[in-house]
Amino acid sequence: MRHRNSIRLALLIAVVSTIGCDRVTKHVATMVLAGGEVHSYLADTVRLEYVENTGGFLGLGADLPDAWRTTLFTAINGVVLLVMAVEALRFRWRGWLLTGVCLVLAGGASNWVDRVARGTVVDFMNLGVGPLRTGVFNVADVAIMLGVAALALSGFRSTHNASPSDQEPGHPA
């Protein structure tokens, strides 16, 4: 039980740190970049620009009516995040599975806070070479993508060496 509580504390610190980093960088981006000027670095490989994203990932759903967007990106997303948090505490996940869930949860929660507080999500980073560029994103999006990669790695590894204890229901907190 003591080991389990240590893991929970470490995960809480990781989630709070990820959210904190995202919140701080979004605040700085708002203060420095909101004027509309694009800052380019490393031969235009890295661009910093302020964007208020009303949609989801890469702006998907931005053209939906306001009521649909609010329901989809705030209410439903909030429920999904809550379920993820409960499941993360309930199951004895380990390794890449636990890492992935926590990163997705942290990034999703930070973007959800933006959406609830502002109605939009602040994005400010863009990477690329020449005409090949990413969409504009933020630290929370990076956490989500790293989390998805960790979940994929966990799924790949579990098909090769299944460990039933990775998903045993845990004891109540």
What are these regions (language model features)?
Residues 1-173:
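Alpha-helical transmembrane bundles and membrane-interface segments of multipass inner-membrane proteins
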